């Protein structure tokens, strides 16, 4: 004990001052994760996003959350007298000095605490190469840490900051990168391989497996060593590293611009998010012969405006990085419900009013505008109910002639649709959805049909419900929703049996846009 105190005093004298070591909380704050996490409404992790590309630092793990196998292996093979020394293993140091004097290959004498001092102060990491003073500085820093932290805290900090492979720092990052799992789930073999990486983070698979085999105390030709070689090859070989990060909402994560270490709870539901992604994949797989490659899904809670699912694209699509929820597309027939709601509200039409579905040519300053139905057929006189449910184009244009272009344009703005042009720019094509809008702006107005005509902002994050305002008359909203749920009225275009005919009450509307 007296020798240790004297040596520490000498080291401090050489440096003029000992300084103060940080506590565990300070260490943790100084090393935030390189990722951020997006959580669903229940706290489940939906998306892990790397936002700091200077390093790969895993989320800080409490010692109890790190595999005991890894803890034991690191202590045994990196610092076997960790529990007994005060930061510097004088026996190991003396042995290393003796080997050096004899010209033999020197064994490492740095303890876990000394290595941790190097992680915290990179200038100390190469203390051995900076001569006696450099080594004394590293030893003094280790003693300061021992006085400040408990042994479990030192081990926790070490396992969270140690460089294992490449840019992966900490057991969490290394476990995820190499084995596709959390640090708590490491097996004995995986713990041995991670420990074997500590003295040689760049080791080739064969070298790594050989060291892990020696740690295991098994002969090179044993089944245990063969298993370690296979595992090392799989984990370390370029291009073979596994990834265990959550990846259910990449587009939403990109939209929210997360900061390192952030854990943001959203209004989404992970189960519904996965279900929506699977439904999109299933639907698109049936449309491959029609050259449909991608799509998006947005699910909003009608009452609260909370976003329940946000799928920006199909996984593996050529442009999967594009967020289809925010991409601009022509609205198509999805604007028709709001046109008819306006006409009904102003008592220009009722659900039973007849409209003529026959060829029409409208004179405009740009020439003749001649709308066509999707199937290029005409059905003669039809009711408003049939025209809207069957998404007929010509009756919609005739309805716009009755309401006027400017009033309908104003109604769309009131509903929150960010139209880029004035009413005259779109002309009568406004009835058929000529404006470009995104799915986020288009979906929210449909909530008004379920909320008595009231419109409020949709949201992604928990909080009080947004204030709403009346835009559509309640009776008009009810009538339009009833029409959109009318399977019989819809059959004029879609038939009685089609994907829109659900087993429960649902108001649905299709829309087609052009590329």
Task: Place the predicted regions along the sequence by residue.
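Short, well-structured active-site flanking segments
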Residues: 83-93, 170-172, 223, 318-321, ...
